[in-house]
Amino acid sequence: MKHLLSMADLEKDELFEILKLAEKLKEERYKGVVTDYLKNKSLAMIFELPSTRTRVSFEVAMTDLGGHALYLGWDELQLGRGEPIKDTARVLSRYVHAVMMRVREHSTIEEFARYSTVPVINGLSNLEHPCQVIADLLTIYEYRGDFKDVTLAWVGDGNNVCNSMILAAALTGMKMVISTPENYDPNPEIVKKAEEMGAKLRFVRDPKEAVKEADVIYTDVWTSMGQEAEKEARLKAFQPYQVSDELLKFSKDDVVVMHCLPAHRGEEITDEVMEGKHSIVFDQAENRLHAQKAILLKLLGKESEVY
């Protein structure tokens, strides 16, 4: 694995190595172990879109690992004034040891990676969000102990996180039921690829049907960054897909609820569910830190130093 742009960049063994490594790093942090696995290493973080969790978790990850992270806003770089992506990629490759990017278009990060001589990490694009989903898998594993008997119901928009989770289902053997309104389905090319990889996917329009056998219910915002003009239409289309106490009545008693945050409480998820006994949302958010530490070590060839 040279870069992490998509969940499809991972082999099954690589994914499980990252999850195992993340568990170990989490344990070390809770014990207060001081590490310097990435001493004298620098990560450039390029943000075309704003972030709370991605920025903080990557910065803290590099600090915890003994390295350094540089925040680079899109408009602070010459990229914002028209410098070609390939030039920026070549230059930054001479300065830093890895680059994380949070961008509008997936094609941007693909082009950057083509010209970069250091690992490039997708911190979010319009197509995928692999860092989020690796953290999600760590969380599911902590709660369920395995993936083979887990059914995850995706309720809401077939967005970038959904796309990455579909590929993750293929890699882990987890079953996935996807419930979206018409015209808001996940990317068909990703669905096809996942099915070719052996993914066990089922598509249903009725969210009540989708959650019946679910061990995990996952939702995300109905209106993502850049879709503000569609907000009214989306609110109308997605209203039946709200994750509420009423919807949970149709699921298992021990179901857990996930959301990658930020949440629009009262839209895709109610306040009661966010704060309720089924929610593992904040454990999930914490795991961004541990998962991304593992991703960084794996890409920089330092994972063997942990054991």
Curated annotation (Swiss-Prot):
Binding site for L-ornithine: 160, 220, 224-225
Pathway assigned in UniProt: Amino-acid biosynthesis; L-arginine biosynthesis; L-arginine from L-ornithine and carbamoyl phosphate: step 1/3
Location in the cell: Cytoplasm
Keyword S-adenosyl-L-methionine: no
Catalytic activity: carbamoyl phosphate + L-ornithine = L-citrulline + phosphate + H(+)
Gene3D superfamilies, sorted: Aspartate/ornithine carbamoyltransferase
The protein's Enzyme Commission number: 2.1.3.3
UniProt keyword terms in alphabetical order: Amino-acid biosynthesis, Arginine biosynthesis, Cytoplasm, Transferase
Coiled coil: none
A cellular component term, taken from the record's GO annotations: cytoplasm
Entries under InterPro entries matching the protein: Asp/Orn_carbamoyltranf_P-bd, Asp/Orn_carbamoylTrfase, Asp/Orn_carbamoylTrfase_sf, Asp_carbamoyltransf_Asp/Orn-bd, Orn/put_carbamltrans, OTCase_ArgI
Top-level taxon in the UniProt lineage: Archaea
Gene Ontology biological-process annotations: arginine biosynthetic process via ornithine; citrulline biosynthetic process; L-arginine biosynthetic process
Binding site for carbamoyl phosphate: 51-54, 78, 102, 129-132, 260-261, 288
A GO MF label: ornithine carbamoyltransferase activity
Pfam families (UniProt xref): OTCace (PF00185), OTCace_N (PF02729)
Protein family according to the UniProt entry: Belongs to the aspartate/ornithine carbamoyltransferase superfamily. OTCase family.
Function, as annotated: Reversibly catalyzes the transfer of the carbamoyl group from carbamoyl phosphate (CP) to the N(epsilon) atom of ornithine (ORN) to produce L-citrulline.
NCBIfam families (UniProt xref): orni_carb_tr, PRK00779.1
PANTHER family in alphabetical order: ORNITHINE CARBAMOYLTRANSFERASE, MITOCHONDRIAL (PTHR45753), ORNITHINE TRANSCARBAMYLASE, MITOCHONDRIAL (PTHR45753:SF3)
Protein name in UniProt: Ornithine carbamoyltransferase
Gene field: argF
